[in-house]
Amino acid sequence: MVRRLSLGTIAAAALLAVAVQQPAQAQATSKPVGCNLAWCPIHVEVVKNAAGAEALRVSFDEIRMAPKHTGATLTWKLMGSPDYEFRADSVTAKGANAASAAAQFPLRLISANEYAYDNRNNNALKYDYEVRVYKKGSPAGSTPLVSNGVVVNAN
């Protein structure tokens, strides 16, 4: 009994060590998150994808806001990526409802490491957005690393 427990513990420790040593990889999709708080952080990180190219990993690509919880602040935070920055167009609405997004999500903050909108959304429309992160010092018009997401009022 003790021997099996020890072998199981050793196997679990070995798997944990392997998982910790693997480099960060870009995720194809992430789980949706429900945001019922006054502040909803979304972590953004530059990582290497399976081919070795730089890509964005975003903690949540679908943000579900409680329909009666307007006034929350959605904040994208650039983490662990000192060679990259947010710029004026780093979180941009796109798709069918892009034209009405500015009224539903007024801009709160733009900095090199944070980008935030206030949620005033009171309808059931889906708002698609694109996150863009730029290499620091790159000229205007440079190609950013891009990730897509959606914000929707949902239970």
Predicted stretch roles:
Residues 43, 73-77, 128-130:
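Beta-strand secondary-structure signal
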Residues 20-26:
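Sec/Tat signal peptide C-region and signal peptidase I cleavage site
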Residues 1-11:
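Bacterial N-terminal signal peptides that target proteins for export
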Residues 83-103:
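Short, surface-exposed alpha-helix to beta-strand junction/turn motifs within ectodomains of secreted
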